[in-house]
Amino acid sequence: MLQNVTPHNKLPGEGNAGLLGLGPEAAAPGKRIRKPSLLYEGFESPTMASVPALQLTPANPPPPEVSNPKKPGRVTNQLQYLHKVVMKALWKHQFAWPFRQPVDAVKLGLPDYHKIIKQPMDMGTIKRRLENNYYWAASECMQDFNTMFTNCYIYNKPTDDIVLMAQTLEKIFLQKVASMPQEEQELVVTIPKNSHKKGAKLAALQGSVTSAHQVPAVSSVSHTALYTPPPEIPTTVLNIPHPSVISSPLLKSLHSAGPPLLAVTAAPPAQPLAKKKGVKRKADTTTPTPTAILAPGSPASPPGSLEPKAARLPPMRRESGRPIKPPRKDLPDSQQQHQSSKKGKLSEQLKHCNGILKELLSKKHAAYAWPFYKPVDASALGLHDYHDIIKHPMDLSTVKRKMENRDYRDAQEFAADVRLMFSNCYKYNPPDHDVVAMARKLQDVFEFRYAKMPDEPLEPGPLPVSTAMPPGLAKSSSESSSEESSSESSSEEEEEEDEEDEEEEESESSDSEEERAHRLAELQEQLRAVHEQLAALSQGPISKPKRKREKKEKKKKRKAEKHRGRAGADEDDKGPRAPRPPQPKKSKKASGSGGGSAALGPSGFGPSGGSGTKLPKKATKTAPPALPTGYDSEEEEESRPMSYDEKRQLSLDINKLPGEKLGRVVHIIQAREPSLRDSNPEEIEIDFETLKPSTLRELERYVLSCLRKKPRKPYTIKKPVGKTKEELALEKKRELEKRLQDVSGQLNSTKKPPKKANEKTESSSAQQVAVSRLSASSSSSDSSSSSSSSSSSDTSDSDSG
């Protein structure tokens, strides 16, 4: 029994031993114990085996770092320009979407991408590096841009769309970099008070998000604080439209929730996690899809409202937190803003030049003017031989600075600098280069506007000669005219009267407005400079003045002979013409300030302030004196402006023309001056300061052609007695008009002197008639003699007669 039991129990004993020995055998490896675990593992193996099978494909390497506490960074004007201007322009371009995030070789099925491209780079990484102050110098950032474009050209075929897109972006990049500040300067950074709180919120938001596709997160949007945040938001960037401007309520809600987290692209927000689809490089670029980031823990706000905030917030926050904005001065768009200078006003020609400069810097011409906005940065553009070839660089910003600093004395210096800029471009670049074509286009704009330069810089602000000319200058001009007269004493009296009138007018203007006096002083200095230039230019042909002097002397001799021959005939006419002299009083009322006093300046300015030489209806009856001495028929260029003496002489000569000739004068003025075409030809007032130089020259030629024929008549045909009497009476009328004007102008609103002058005229008319022809000839020989000089010469001649 026991034997049976024992052998029988051995079998179970073995099994029991095995079961009882489970503990000891578990410590040692045994097949039985591991089989269940192997079966269990085998049961799960189909699911687990799929994971390493998917991981056999090459994984994307970690993206480039966007912040490094060990690597020093800083904020410079060039880096800020690259961030605010260059990156902003590239980011919103329609071809920028493939470059906004690192290349996902797994999703795009590019297994060899990271074998060929050893240093990946994208605009999102560059942008985040700029936001995190990762770069020490702008050259590092520019190198990243170049790496990104070079990677695209290396990996893709030249005919691929992505290559054309990269070329377009690179061209825009180079255009913007050309306008970058030339010298790199570090900027002072101010740290906002609440930056730590925002950083804590950002860390909390970032820590609550997990992702299978880890990318570095963006630090706080405050431009100054650097953070190394924990894991980030998994997002996929899609095409987005250009974000609109953020309203203030949205900004407030965003600030209360903390800064939004951005993808590797930093500005364009991405879809929620539910929509994770890769974007291939050659996707449709015409239908952008606006998406937004829904950050866990942030308040519930519409995705559409978060999207523009995420895209626009960093630059807006930086601008609001940074009162100093040096790069704004370097932007091409801000170059049009005219900064008022405190260094005095520009002349008329330089104002025109300043307008040309503004147009060259305007957005209208920016497409082909941008290479000339800033000095050529030879080191940044790799033009190592530029300064060897171009000895005098020039650009529009330098021209603008010189204009604001009043470094240009005249328009010629301004034009020389602009043309130097274009010639430098033509000299350095080959003729078929794009920048040469742009330079030619911009130069066409410049030359077209420069050709419209005002002929006379002082014409737009006409001034009465008595106030505009300083006494010394007026005196010198009067002396030059007195040298041409036949009577020295009469010319001295004329100068004294001129100076008295000028002093009266100057005192009135200075008492009325001090600013106007200051302006007049400036214009007087400019006028002196112009006269000096004209004198220097006109001294080229020296032979002509000598001829004029010889002709003057000959004509003086002829006049003297005429005086002797006519003396007897004048006395015969004394009786019949005695009752006629009182008429000038009526004639003066009809003609106003017309007739023009020889002592009152080139355009017949009266002391009372009336400017202009009137050609009234009654003045058409006046007969002219003979040709004035000292003014010969010298041909002048139409464009050359008239001097003070020439205008004065022309005013006197027009008053000498007979009635039948004045119609032609009016016709010339109306034909050449559009503003006077509708005026009444019966009575037209001429202001020589407003007439074009070409009009004045045409009038001068016509007047000279009329007066040149007069001296020849006495030699060929003797005038009958009747004609001589008519000429005598009209000449006397003209002299009395001059005298009345002088007296009324000096006393200015007093009526007694004109009456005295009339009484004196009536009392001495009998004596003056006898010698009127002699006075007429003397007045014709002295074109600039005044009324007082005429009357004095008349009385002296009557005494001698």
Swiss-Prot record:
GO cellular component terms, semicolon-separated: chromatin; cytoplasm; nuclear speck; nucleoplasm; nucleus
Outcome when changing Q182A: Partial loss of homodimerization
Protein keywords: Acetylation, Bromodomain, Chromatin regulator, Chromosome, Host-virus interaction, Nucleus, Phosphoprotein, Repeat, Transcription, Transcription regulation
Keyword Nucleus on entry: yes
Sequence motif Nuclear localization signal, residues: 555-559
Impact reported for I154A: Partial loss of homodimerization. Abolished binding to histone H4 acetylated at 'Lys-12' (H4K12ac)
Biased composition (Basic residues): 544-566
Amino acid composition bias (Gly residues), ranges on this chain: 592-612
Impact noted for substituting D160A: Abolished binding to histone H4 acetylated at 'Lys-12' (H4K12ac)
GO biological process: chromatin looping; chromatin remodeling; neural tube closure; nucleosome assembly; positive regulation of T-helper 17 cell lineage commitment; protein localization to chromatin; regulation of transcription by RNA polymerase II; spermatogenesis
Impact noted for substituting L174E: Loss of homodimerization
Phosphoserine: modified positions: S37, S298, S301, S305, S633
Record note on quaternary structure: Homodimer. Interacts with E2F1. Interacts with (acetylated) STAT3; promoting STAT3 recruitment to chromatin. Interacts with CTCF; promoting BRD2 recruitment to chromatin.
Protein name in the entry: Bromodomain-containing protein 2
Originating organism: Homo sapiens (Human)
Lineage: Eukaryota, Metazoa, Chordata, Craniata, Vertebrata
